[in-house]
Amino acid sequence: MGFKRFVEIGRVALVNYGEDYGKLVVIVDVVDQNRALVDAPDMERIQMNLKRLSLTDIVIDINRVPKKKVLIEAMEKADVKNKWEKSSWGRKLIVQKRRAALNDFDRFKIMLAKIKRAGIVRQELAKLKREIAA
């Protein structure tokens, strides 16, 4: 099976390194085989190394090097933010950020909830084993 995510104009990518880490950007122009011009509604248009980008499955329909206003409209029309949040990759990153923001007491409460859940599962499993044996 071949590649499905190509470096192309309109491809949405996740920045995986540097000061813009974790931001969704759109490739607006390909500079050469190693660099692309990327833009997002909340940042300046910059040249970025492709090694810093993780390409997503989301592609929006834009022309080469669009104005900021056109880019924002295209992103809203394509519903990029919701598509990202509904994707499994986006959900995993949201969960990671939420877990990283937990304090010690929150982690303690989660530990107690896991212990309680494991006890309930163990009781139900024992009940089913008794029914099968009888």
From Swiss-Prot:
Gene3D superfamilies: 2.30.30.30, 6.10.250.2270. One of its GO terms (molecular function) is structural constituent of ribosome. Pfam families: Ribosomal_L14e. The keyword Ribosomal protein applies. One of its GO terms (biological process) is translation. One of its GO terms (cellular component) is endoplasmic reticulum. It comes from the Eukaryota. InterPro entries: Rib_uL2_dom2, Ribosomal_eL14, Ribosomal_eL14_dom, Translation_prot_SH3-like_sf. SUPFAM superfamilies: Translation proteins SH3-like domain. Keywords: Ribonucleoprotein, Ribosomal protein. Belongs to the eukaryotic ribosomal protein eL14 family. This is Large ribosomal subunit protein eL14z.
